């Protein structure tokens, strides 16, 4: 019996080593009950981090929360055809790998990303989606780039410290962006647009190269700089109440 227990111990130890080095040498603290469809990284004292999403997905859902000792957590449904993989460190790269061979696995799924509110984030959405939803209120963001196409891009941003650049290089049908009230946003429509609503202006047939600069933007110490180099159909800017708790 003792020999059998020893062999089991060796197998368990070997499995732990495989988990630790399976992706780019990055160790994952997964409990015995953890699903293969969940990946996380430890906070490890970091105050800032960059994330690049490199695999396309039907729906990408990103939010901010107090994760205590975790830097980020990513999940796909247990029945999804893919599972999340995290690699690298600067930036951290989120990709998707095959989730198994079960014929009933779904190809209509959401990749859910929860980011720690304890760090300042730089985000690059570099893979196409049908819909990207990112509610980043309650967090801190230094910059965002969307470099791949999306049917619907729906993003809520926190109050920035200084200038927060937002680069839109991937084509988008509907671009919905919610900003804190009282923070000016300059919008550069580099590729043209069918419709733009900034809250103070409603424009149709907007020519490429149009720059919409609100009063006070040039001297503001907290502001957004939205540069849409690619074309889009509709841009709607709304405002949320910064006095609300998120």
Which residues does each predicted region cover?
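Terminal targeting segments of Actinobacterial cell-envelope proteins
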Residues: 1-8
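Short, surface-exposed interaction patches in beta-rich subdomains
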Residues: 73-86, 90-107, 145, 152-246
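Hydrophobic membrane-insertion alpha-helices, especially the h-region
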Residues: 11-26
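Membrane-proximal soluble helical/coiled-coil segments
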Residues: 58, 84-88, 119
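C-terminal region of N-terminal signal peptides and the immediate post-cleavage residues
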Residues: 22-42
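Short extracytoplasmic
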Residues: 41-70
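Extended, structured, electrostatic nucleic-acid-contact surfaces
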Residues: 36-52, 106-109, 113-123, 158-166, ...
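Extended beta-solenoid/beta-helix repeat architectures
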Residues: 116-120, 126-129, 136-152, 158-163, ...
């Amino acid at each position: 019996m003792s020999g059998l227990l020893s062999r089991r111990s060796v197998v368990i130890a070997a499995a732990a080593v495989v988990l630790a080095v399976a992706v780019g040498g990055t160790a994952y603290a997964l409990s015995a009950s953890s699903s293969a469809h969940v990946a996380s990284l430890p906070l490890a004292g970091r105050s800032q981090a960059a994330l690049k999403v490199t695999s396309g997905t039907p729906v990408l859902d990103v939010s901010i929360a107090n994760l205590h000792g975790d830097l980020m957590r990513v999940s796909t449904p247990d029945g999804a055809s893919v599972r999340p993989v995290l690699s690298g460190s600067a930036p951290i790269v989120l990709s998707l790998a095959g989730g198994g061979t079960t014929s009933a696995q779904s190809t209509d799924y959401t990749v859910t990303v929860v980011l720690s509110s304890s760090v300042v984030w730089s985000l690059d959405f570099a893979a196409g989606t049908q819909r990207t939803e990112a509610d980043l209120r309650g967090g801190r963001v230094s910059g965002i780039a969307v470099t791949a196409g999306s049917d619907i891009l729906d993003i809520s941003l926190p109050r920035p410290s200084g200038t927060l650049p937002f680069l839109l290089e991937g084509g988008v049908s509907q671009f919905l962006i919610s900003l804190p009230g009282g923070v000016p946003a300059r919008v550069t429509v580099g590729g043209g647009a069918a419709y733009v609503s900034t809250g103070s202006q409603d424009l149709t047939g907007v020519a490429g190269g149009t720059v919409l600069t609100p009063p006070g933007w040039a001297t503001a110490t907290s502001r957004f700089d939205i540069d849409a180099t690619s074309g889009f159909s509709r841009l709607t800017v709304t405002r949320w109440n910064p006095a609300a708790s998120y």
